[in-house]
């Protein structure tokens, strides 16, 4: 008796339709976005000579700009540091109020989460512009903008970290009658300390980069000097400034990455 090879059933129709539909939606969104943004590969190709011509204006570098770069660069680092420090402190209560396992009232939890989502939806550059209008020009509006951004992001990351902890220590503390604060201090903080320290270092990296452009709206830092150079078409000094900022950010990233690798 000769046996015929088994015939595989055809693949289900619904998953195939879902896959085809997903690709169709993706393609439609791509074409619509390209149309409404006037995206054109031809225009990009035509701009390549201008791109190289722009960078050609930056050579040779004008190293005479170095003395006036130091103070604004230091101010930028101070804005990022203070913003990260105070933002981290401000985030602490929101971390625990926005976590399921540390908040007894779900209304409070969802209220805090909604508030944080609203705060995060506003770009830090817009916060800086608003603070400049309220507090006048200078580094203080930049610090306030970084504080708001840092607090909202760390609170979000922190609440998710708290919800992922081992519930055993919390249950043990509840069993012996520990209060809410004691449960957080002894059952939660030891489990999230290293991860949160890593997040803080990462946010500091982001804040250093963000602080370099806050000066464009008058919020202090090296961004103000960069805007001045560009306004006067001083591309050679602009190149020196960009090179210095790149080196500092690269150094901070390397140190922060090493520190975070030791924490986790």
Give each language-model segment a name.
Residues 12, 18-22, 239-264:
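C-terminal transmembrane helix and the adjacent membrane-cytosol boundary/short C-terminal tail
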Residues 84-92, 96, 100, 125, ...:
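Hydrophobic positions within alpha-helical transmembrane segments of bacterial inner-membrane proteins
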Residues 133, 208-245, 264:
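Glycine-rich helix-loop "coupling/hinge" segments at transmembrane-helix boundaries
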